Structures are given as C-alpha cells and as structure tokens.
C-alpha cells in the first residue's frame, strides 16, 4: 500500500468513526431512555406525559427478547413522564441530553426499579421508595385488623390506630422535607399531590399554603413551564371556590 493509499484508508476510517458517533449523539431537544427488564413478558413500555388532563401517551418503547430497550425521546420543555409496564408505572423527570438507564423486574416494576443518569428522576425514586414502604405499612395494618381476635379487638384496634397516626405524621414529614429540600424542581409537584390512604396530604380545602410555596419556587426556575402555569391556575381557581363558599356560609 503506497503512501497516498494509506492516507486515504485512514481518512475513511476517521470519517466512519465520526459518522458512527454522530448517529449516537442526542438531539438538542431529546433524552435517551434505555435499560433492562428482567423476566419480561411484555412487548413494550408505554411512555406518557403527565399533564393537566392526566397521562397522555407519548411513545411506545419496544422490549426485545432479552428484556432490553432503548429509545431517544424528544421533548419541548422539562416535564414529567409516566413509564408503564403492564399495570404498573413509575414517574420520571428527564432533562434534555440525559442518558437514563433503568433496571427492574417485571413482577414488581414500581418497587424494584433502579434508575441512573437523571438526577431529578433519582430524587423521585427515593420519594417513591418511601411512599412504597408506607403503602406496605398500611396494608400490614389492614391485615392485622382483619385477623384480630374478637376478645382483643379493641386493644389491637387502638394499637393500630396509633401506628396509623404515626405513619401519617411520618409521611407528612418526609414529603414536606422533600419539598423544602428541592425548591424549583418539578419533582416537588409529585410530592405536593401525594396521598395517604387515598386522602391528599396537602388538601387545598384546608390550606393552599404548600401549593403556593411550590408555585413560588417554580416561578423562579420554570416560570413559563406548563406545569407551573397549571399549578398557578389551580390555585387561582381554588381560592375563588373557597372565597365563594365562605361568602355563601355568611
């Protein structure tokens, strides 16, 4: 091979490498979602955007016969997504340019998943873990009450009620701490709307102060984001409702 041929050969290799790298690069308005689902029988994951009217399906992500999946997702602004596998789902909060990796098992998708490559989504994972543990505690209390001996029922019921109140106070604390420790993050919206045994932790009918606190921080970081505007309109609407109800009672 002469000198010119060698130069031409190396130029071709270089161009090929550049081409390969470009194909893997993310667009300016996208993020990468990949990972593995162990023991998967589902053909795909469903990615839905969390918005004002609930979940809006955004994309379907195929899962191959080895349980692996990978897809680049375009997004127009920071937002929240639901990632569903069968009947279970998790919430993620990706940012443009992130390469997110998720590993989970199919039979306990929401409880088993691990996530890397997305700081906001990792925060949600920790919040979800605490919420999952609270649900297990409530389930355990319910089972204990069902199996209680009729003779000892009253004392067992009193004991469970004390546990119930303590568990609620614990969830209120960790949820409030999460909001206080992550001001301006979209993840605080998930904390804001957390429920305990089906009842909102921060019920707007009692107080809108926590809603206003979350909004104040979001208006500093994401003033024009759809989620900020939705929360703002929600507060305005509920304040009017509360005001009208107060006037009616008078």
Which role fits each region the language model picked out?
Residues 1-8:
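Bacterial N-terminal signal peptides that target proteins for export
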Residues 20-173, 177-178:
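A non-transmembrane, solvent-exposed segment enriched in polar/low-complexity residues
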Residues 165-172, 204-212:
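Helix-turn-helix repeat elements of alpha-solenoid scaffolds
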Residues 179, 183, 203-206, 223:
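Structural signature of alpha-solenoid helical repeat scaffolds
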Residues 184-198:
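Amphipathic alpha-helical repeat scaffolds of TPR domains
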Residues 196-203, 243:
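Short coil/turn linking the two alpha-helices of tandem helical-hairpin repeats
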Residues 210-250:
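N-proximal helix/coil linker or "cap" segments that precede and/or mark the start of modular domains
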């Amino acid at each position: 091979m002469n000198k010119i041929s060698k130069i031409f050969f190396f130029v071709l290799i270089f161009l090929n490498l550049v081409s390969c790298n470009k194909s893997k690069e993310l667009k300016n308005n996208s993020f990468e979602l990949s990972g593995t689902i162990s023991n998967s029988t589902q053909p795909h994951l469903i990615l839905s955007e969390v918005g004002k009217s609930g979940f809006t399906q955004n994309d379907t992500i195929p899962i191959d016969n080895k349980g692996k999946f990978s897809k680049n997702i375009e997004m127009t602004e920071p937002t929240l997504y639901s990632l569903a596998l069968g009947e279970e789902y998790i919430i993620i909060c990706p940012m443009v340019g992130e390469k997110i990796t998720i590993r989970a098992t199919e039979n306990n998708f929401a409880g088993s998943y691990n996530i890397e490559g997305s700081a906001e989504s990792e925060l949600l994972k920790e919040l979800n873990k605490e919420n999952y543990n609270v649900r297990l505690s409530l389930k355990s209390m319910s089972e204990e009450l069902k199996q209680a001996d009729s003779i000892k029922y009253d004392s067992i019921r009193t004991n469970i009620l004390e546990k119930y109140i303590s568990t609620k106070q614990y969830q209120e604390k960790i949820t409030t701490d999460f909001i206080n420790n992550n001001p301006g993050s979209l993840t605080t919206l998930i904390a804001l709307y957390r429920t305990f045994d089906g009842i909102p932790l921060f019920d707007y009918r009692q107080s809108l102060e926590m809603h206003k606190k979350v909004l104040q921080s979001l208006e500093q970081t994401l003033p024009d984001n759809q989620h900020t505007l939705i929360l703002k309109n929600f507060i305005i609407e509920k304040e009017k409702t509360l005001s009208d109800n107060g006037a009616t009672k008078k």
